[in-house]
Amino acid sequence: MGVYLNPGNEKFAKAVQSEIYVDKTGLIEYTNQVINTVQRYVCVTRPRRFGKSMTADMLTAYYGKECDSRELFSGLKISQNAVFAQHLNQYPTIFLNMQEFLSRSKEIGQVIDRVRRMLLRELKNSYPDVDYFDDTDLVESLQDIYAATKQSFVIIIDEWDCVFREYQQDKKAQEEYLDFLRDFLKDKVYVALAYLTGILPIKKYGTHSALNMFDEFTMLDPGPLAEYVGFTEQEVEELCGRYQMDLAEIKNWYDGYSFPGESSVYSPRSVVNAMRFRKIGNYWNQTETFEALQWYIDLNFDGLRDDVLQMMAGKKIPVNTGSFTNDMTTFRTEDDVLTLLIHLGYLGYEEQNKYVFIPNAEVQSEYASAVTVSQWGDISKALKNSADLLLSLIHISEPT
């Protein structure tokens, strides 16, 4: 086993062995349907704390060679599927967490170079007998391996969008990164399955996307993967029974996301923490969410401040998500900001009527905190008074 090539199943095993593990292996049924097909390119985006990395670890454990995951998946939902054994541990699997590469590099060229060098080292160690045309070229080396072995790869990229979050103002770096991914993945015979996961959908430049071969499943439309976005009503009911927690309180605090076919989706990490600690409260990362939310509120595009107030009062606001370009800086209208907040988990989205809203009390408390320190001129005092009242009501509703 390697670090990036066939890294094994240990990370997913730790998740399964945790005090609370909710079985989401049914998602593998979908990836098994599209593997080795034209639809083999899958991009799933969700907010932080919604289990993206665990899903990536699950797929790595299931598909990756050089480990035996049969016992690990025994008793889980996917083990009952007719083609479970057909794909289990059958593919050389590449797993990349782009945030790790980014944190060790000073600029995007170093990120890409490090990915190439690390993968090439492990590929050459695992396939020493392949006649490489150019063993310094990642794409050509993968093509040579496929030509020699007829084995195609499962490629899983976690935090795929970190470049767009860390290099928000550097369009050249973003384009260089997209070009690398396109060259690495698009129309390559050695790709059995490409699975990208992150927070932001795939970046678009004008009407063109460098990665337009991907099917995308987002907070706007997760399609057939809706039940895997977060915890479902049934899953939360079972946890509440197990931990003797009040379902109505849990629903008030952590529910509120909904999609066609899945009317109640809960924030998974918050539910897990509420169960483990037997305490309902705000489990979002305070510093990260507070600072980010405050910045977006203070942009105040097209009357955003008034709409935030209305949503804090329980109203729904119409939104047009079509113009959003899938980054964190290119805002032309209030709708673009609202759409980003959907992807970040700060807003729920009602697809049928095209409305956004604050999904639950946990997120409401983040808005209340952000508003209290925002500089909104003459209405700042009124906003702060409203926020103080909301915070008071939220704290009153907390169980003692």
Model-identified regions with their sequence ranges:
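Residue-level detector of conserved catalytic or cofactor/ligand-binding positions
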Residues: L391-T400
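Conserved lysine of the Walker
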Residues: K52
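Short, amphipathic alpha-helical interaction segments positioned at domain boundaries
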Residues: A361-L389
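N-terminal pre-Walker A segment at the start of P-loop NTPase domains
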Residues: P7-E29
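Substrate-engagement module of ASCE P-loop NTPases
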Residues: D144-Y146, E175-A194
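Conserved helicase/translocase motor-coupling segment
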Residues: N282, Q286, W295-L340
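Flexible phosphate/Mg2+-sensing switch loops adjacent to catalytic phosphate-binding sites
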Residues: Y62-N89, H208
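Amphipathic alpha-helical segments of the small helical/lid subdomains adjacent to P-loop NTPase cores
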Residues: G206-N212, F217-A274, D307-V308, M312
